[in-house]
Regions:
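Conserved ABC transporter NBD signature motif
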Residues: 57-67, 72-73
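Conserved ABC ATPase signature
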Residues: 89, 130-134
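Conserved ABC ATPase "signature" region
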Residues: 97, 101, 108-126
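A short, proline-enriched helix->beta-strand linker immediately N-terminal to the Walker B motif
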Residues: 149-153, 182
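Catalytic Walker B motif of ABC-type/P-loop ATPase nucleotide-binding domains
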Residues: 155-159
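Helical segment within the ABC ATPase nucleotide-binding domain
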Residues: 169-181
Length: 238
């Protein structure tokens, strides 16, 4: 699968959130989208999830314009927004069952997948508690689980590691790398360590402009493999 972003620009009133972004995101590896807060990453994610339209440019999934034919991506999309909402009066199981019904996932398959996801994210023992009793990190894990329901072929996750402890971050990283073998996985983050051992390709965005796109080795070719140092160099030169 190929997700193509072609000269995408997004304007909000007098503010340009994105300026002529061109990227190609393929299945087979995690694509990391990095940049500081406010760089335009979440805006691009929302465009790809067809929650907002670009002011100019197009996005295509295997050659199909997703702005003109949004179902081309919606039917295969798993999306975790930066501020994922959950229903506080529901338990984790109830919430995930509700999301699976919205995605038209077979009930028996959904039950198995929900149990597996709760186990992966160490939530099984809390699955009957209301989400209002969960910590922020626990709710984030539920949100990630919701994005993974239905075995999406395009997975877009925006700042997924927020609130996760180190072990949970490792589990998430390993899961994303496994999933990316057969699908598109786009990971947006401002934390370089999130993509350091995860991404096979990455792009750096700052102030709505694309500063770099390529492999991690290309990104760090002038810093002896040090990704944090390379990131700081790009930010300083900017």
């Amino acid at each position: 699968m190929l997700l193509s972003i072609k000269n995408v620009t997004k304007n909000y009133s007098q503010v340009q959130a994105l300026a002529g972004i061109n990227l190609e995101i393929r299945s087979g590896g995690v694509f990391g989208l990095v940049g500081p807060n406010g760089a335009g990453k979440s805006t691009l994610m929302k465009i790809l999830a067809t929650l907002t339209a670009p002011t100019d440019g197009t996005c295509e999934l295997d050659g199909v314009n997703i702005q003109k034919q949004p179902n081309a991506i919606r039917r295969v999309l798993g999306y975790l927004p930066q501020d994922a909402a959950v229903y506080p009066n529901l338990t984790a199981v109830e919430f995930l069952e509700y999301i699976s019904s919205l995605k038209s996932v077979d009930a028996r398959a959904a039950k198995r997948q929900i149990n597996d996801l709760l186990e992966i994210f160490n939530l099984s023992q809390y699955k009957k508690r209301r989400l209002s009793d969960y910590s922020g990190g626990m709710r984030q894990r539920v949100g990630i689980s919701a994005a993974l329901l239905g075995d999406p072929q395009v997975l877009i996750v925006d700042e997924p590691s927020v609130g996760l402890d180190p072990v949970e971050r490792i589990n998430l990283r390993n899961l994303l790398m496994q999933l990316a073998k057969e699908r598109i996985v786009l990971l947006s983050t401002h934390i370089i360590s999130d993509i350091e051992q995860t991404a096979t390709e990455l792009a750096l965005i700052q102030k709505g402009r694309l500063l770099f796109s390529g492999s991690p080795s290309e990104f760090t070719q002038n810093t002896a493999g040090d990704m944090e140092k390379a990131y700081l160099q790009y930010m300083t030169n900017e």
